[in-house]
A protein has these predicted regions:
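Short, low-complexity, charged amphipathic interaction modules
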Residues: 1-13
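Polyanion-binding interface signature
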Residues: 13-174
């Protein structure tokens, strides 16, 4: 079963809105790479929640959207079960079809074993199906600080430093 992709451009051409502090906001019209990112918050209409993982953010979003748009979720579930789309949304009876079924309420389950990019694409799928304005769903995330990473990778661990000192002592002794 092939999965529809909702990106207009190849992933390499996608752009993510970033600001200088290492934080970004997902542009659901043009989702870019989410590698090395961690969600910070989800804003759904007037509800704003801090988030710590992409999976939990996705489940929170699905739970909120399901409460407001149950008929659309019923339609998306039927599409999944008919084989028109990849299996990502099912009911109680079919939750065994998912690798990691996550309960979102009202007898619905979503696939929880996905990448950050897949979660973002599914959120966009729900936004589009339910005709939610892109401005009403805001996902903020942090990016890995490249400077902090490079400093960390260059610095020695305690054991490595100890071995270096031992070698230097050995060389000066002989």
């Amino acid at each position: 079963i092939s999965q529809k992709t909702y990106d207009d451009k190849p992933e390499t051409e996608n752009k993510i809105q970033d600001d200088a502090q290492g934080y970004g906001t997902i542009d659901f019209k043009n989702i870019g790479s989410l590698e090395y990112t961690k969600p910070v918050s989800l804003k759904y209409f007037d509800v704003e929640k801090p988030e710590k993982s992409w999976r939990v953010l996705y489940i929170d979003f699905c739970t909120l959207a399901l409460a407001d748009y149950p008929a659309d979720f019923e339609l998306m579930k039927k599409e999944c079960l008919s084989g028109k789309t990849a299996m990502w949304l099912v009911d109680e009876r079919h939750k065994g079809l998912l690798r990691v079924a996550k309960d979102i309420g009202s007898g619905f389950y979503v696939e929880g074993n996905r990448s950050a990019l897949d979660f973002a694409r599914n959120i966009r799928r729900i936004i589009d199906q339910c005709k939610i304005s892109h401005e009403d769903v805001i996902v903020r995330y942090s990016t890995r600080n490249e400077n902090a990473e490079s400093e960390h990778s260059v610095s020695e661990t305690g054991k490595a430093q100890e071995r270096r000192y031992h070698r230097e002592d050995k060389q000066s002794f002989y």
